[in-house]
């Protein structure tokens, strides 16, 4: 990744885990961090905002070494017929990127929304 270019940070944040993947604008070169196993070992800490902040600061250091100037952020929740709101680590990760000195371009929500897809789980409610 050359000097002065931008990347795309894909933040997939559920209530069980947070995954941050950084690519260049074409989607080619990838740097990935997952909170489960890579940052914390306890399963109860995987989705916490503190863990997302740690991941984002580690990725910001890697981006600085690679010469990236800033990132566009795409936040994704589980979506589909599951939860449409991102987990607690999404905002913390964005804030940590900004505090670490990474310039932030666009922030998009790319949660998949069904166009009347499959039936959600759970029983019938009358």
From Swiss-Prot:
Xref: InterPro entries: Ribosomal_uS11, Ribosomal_uS11_archaeal, Ribosomal_uS11_CS, Ribosomal_uS11_sf
Keyword Ribonucleoprotein recorded: yes
An annotated GO cellular component: ribosome
GO MF terms held by the record: rRNA binding; structural constituent of ribosome
Biological process terms in GO annotation: translation
Residue ranges of the region described as Disordered: 107-126
Keywords: Ribonucleoprotein, Ribosomal protein, RNA-binding, rRNA-binding
Entry annotated with the keyword RNA-binding: yes
Gene3D superfamilies, per database record: Ribosomal protein S11
Function field: Located on the platform of the 30S subunit.
Annotated PANTHER family: 40S RIBOSOMAL PROTEIN S14/30S RIBOSOMAL PROTEIN S11
HAMAP family: Ribosomal_uS11
The protein's assembly and partners: Part of the 30S ribosomal subunit.
Similarity comment: family membership: Belongs to the universal ribosomal protein uS11 family.
Protein name as it appears in the record: Small ribosomal subunit protein uS11
Native organism: Methanococcoides burtonii (strain DSM 6242 / NBRC 107633 / OCM 468 / ACE-M)
């Amino acid at each position: 990744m050359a000097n002065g270019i931008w990347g795309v940070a894909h933040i997939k944040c559920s209530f069980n885990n947070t995954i941050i993947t950084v690519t260049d604008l074409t989607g080619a070169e990838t740097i990935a961090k997952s909170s489960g196993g890579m940052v914390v070992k306890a399963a109860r800490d995987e989705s916490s905002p503190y863990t997302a902040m740690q991941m984002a600061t580690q990725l910001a250091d890697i981006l600085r070494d690679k010469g990236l100037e800033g990132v566009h952020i795409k936040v994704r929740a589980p979506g589909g017929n599951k939860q449409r709101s991102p987990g607690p680590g999404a905002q913390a990760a964005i804030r940590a990127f900004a505090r670490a000195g990474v310039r932030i371009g666009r922030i998009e929500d790319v949660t998949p929304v069904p166009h009347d897809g499959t039936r959600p789980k759970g029983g019938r409610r009358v």
